[in-house]
Design a protein with these regions (language model features):
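Mature N-terminal segment immediately following signal peptide/propeptide cleavage
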Residues: 1
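Cofactor-binding active-site loop characterized by glycine-rich and histidine/acidic residues
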Residues: 6-146, 164-170, 175, 180-182
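Glycine-rich ThDP/TPP pyrophosphate-binding loop and its adjacent helix/strand module
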Residues: 92-255
């Protein structure tokens, strides 16, 4: 579903029927895999490339398209045409644009779950660029100290806006930062939907018995621009070619 919708949205963008679009093409396995492994009543805090969260949660496509086209029947009644919306009915919290702050919101939800002893887990998304914000440190530190049942999912897609990871941080992997917080951390193939699903499903069951935070780095690649108007001229073609061979849909079809 996400890929089909993405392709349609790119057509609508060229037709002038939507004003902008943040594409998640090539990264769909992460949002679909994570959401499929979560329970319907558990909160997820997605970001602007996680269309798969909304489709996997079962939101009617008519409402999604109304939202993206700025119609009154959308979730924000035409006030926003992107992913800055949530829905209590589907337990989705709307994204905060600079991404870091929503990690702290996830801590709050996880704390409520822990106090209520309801066994629910919270999943929150950010990008590798978002980990350079101070909110990332604060959220992970609090979650670690309080043993909050939250999974921090970092979609490492190679670029934060136009800045490559080599100019973002010195550690080899984002997951290595987990040690500094005394937190379990893993790096997985974000283009393999089965690996994403199995990892989240396994962690969920364990966290229900032993509440604690997890840092999960999903390796993937951004195949479009930060948003469609920016393009990808700053990305080496060999990188694009390499990751095109790792397309998550083709991976799953060949399984």
């Amino acid at each position: 579903k996400p890929r089909m919708i993405e392709e349609k949205m790119l057509i609508l963008l060229r037709q002038g029927k939507i004003s902008k679009w943040f594409s998640g093409i090539g990264q769909e396995a992460i949002s679909v895999g994570v959401t499929s492994a979560m329970e319907q009543e558990e909160y997820i805090l997605p970001m602007h490339r996680n269309l798969g969260v909304f489709t996997t949660k079962g939101i009617p496509l008519s409402r999604l398209f109304a939202q993206f086209q700025g119609k009154m029947s959308g979730f924000t009644k035409g006030r926003d045409r992107s992913f800055h919306f949530g829905t209590q009915d589907y337990k989705i919290v709307g994204m905060i644009s600079h991404l870091g702050p929503q990690l702290g919101v996830a801590d709050g939800i996880a704390l409520a779950n822990k106090l209520q002893e309801n066994g629910q887990i919270t999943a929150v998304f950010t990008g590798e660029g978002g980990t350079s914000e101070g909110d990332f440190h604060e959220a992970l530190n609090v979650a670690a100290v309080w043993d909050l049942p939250v999974i921090f999912i970092v979609e490492n897609n190679g670029y934060g806006l136009s800045t490559p990871t080599s100019e973002q941080f010195r550690c080899e992997q984002i997951a290595h930062r987990g040690k500094g917080y005394g937190m379990e951390a893993y790096t997985i193939d974000g283009n393999n939907v089965l690996e994403v699903y199995n990892t989240i499903a396994s962690l969920r069951e364990d966290l229900k018995k032993n509440p604690r935070p997890i840092l999960l780095e999903c390796m993937t690649f951004r195949m479009r621009g930060h948003e469609e108007a920016s393009g990808t001229k700053y990305v080496p073609q060999e990188l694009m070619d390499e990751w095109a061979k790792k397309d998550p849909l083709e991976n799953f079809e060949q399984y």
